[in-house]
């Protein structure tokens, strides 16, 4: 019986590692320039994702009268290679979202149901006010890190 539990636990861990690695591959494919020959490490991928998210935040916080893309941000311009298809969730990202997720501009949640059921095999957390990341980690400031 203990052997069966260990085998099942190992299988769950293999699946989890595979899912994490797949997530990094998807993120890397979205962010890494096509002409870049060396594959980014996980740390590099996360670092570049943070930069990209920060640049998107700047774009979202801009005055609507200003141009939407600045020439001072050459790393991630809003071109077709890094376009997130008008914020639509791609099928490749669906495994990382709540099961009942739907963008606000495409569908409404029936009868005001805002419960979140996450696809994680080990997750039993349900909350409508915090993301899983916010529930697990304190807010982080990246201002102390050097920009490369």
Swiss-Prot record:
A Pfam family reported for this protein in Swiss-Prot or TrEMBL: HLH
In this chain, the stretch annotated as Disordered covers 1-21, 63-83, 112-132
Keywords, sorted A to Z: Developmental protein, DNA-binding, Neurogenesis, Nucleus, Transcription, Transcription regulation
Which InterPro entries does this one have?
A: bHLH_dom, HLH_DNA-bd_sf, MASH1/Ascl1a-like
Q: An example Gene Ontology cellular component term from the record?
A: RNA polymerase II transcription regulator complex
Principal place where this protein is found? nucleus
GO-annotated molecular function:
DNA-binding transcription factor activity, RNA polymerase II-specific; protein dimerization activity; RNA polymerase II transcription regulatory region sequence-specific DNA binding; sequence-specific DNA binding
Describe the outcome of a gene knockout.
Answer: RNAi-mediated knockdown disrupts differentiation of ASE L/R sensory neurons.
Q: Under which name does UniProt file this protein? A: Helix-loop-helix protein 14
Q: Which organism is it from?
A: Caenorhabditis elegans
What are the top taxonomic ranks of the organism?
Answer: Eukaryota, Metazoa, Ecdysozoa, Nematoda, Chromadorea
Name the gene: hlh-14
């Amino acid at each position: 019986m203990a052997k069966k539990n260990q085998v099942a636990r190992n299988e769950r861990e293999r699946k989890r590692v595979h899912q994490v690695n797949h997530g990094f591959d998807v993120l890397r494919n979205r962010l890494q320039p096509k002409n870049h020959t060396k594959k980014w490490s996980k740390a590099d991928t996360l670092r570049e994702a943070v930069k990209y998210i920060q640049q998107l935040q700047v774009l979202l916080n801009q005055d609507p009268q200003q141009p939407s893309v600045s020439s001072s941000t050459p790393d991630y311009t809003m071109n077709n290679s890094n376009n997130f298809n008008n914020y639509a969730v791609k099928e490749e990202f669906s495994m990382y979202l709540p099961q009942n997720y739907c963008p606000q501009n495409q569908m409404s949640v029936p009868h005001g149901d805002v419960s979140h059921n996450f696809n994680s095999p080990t997750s039993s957390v349900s909350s409508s006010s915090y993301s899983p990341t916010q529930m697990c980690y304190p807010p982080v400031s990246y201002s102390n890190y050097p920009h490369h």
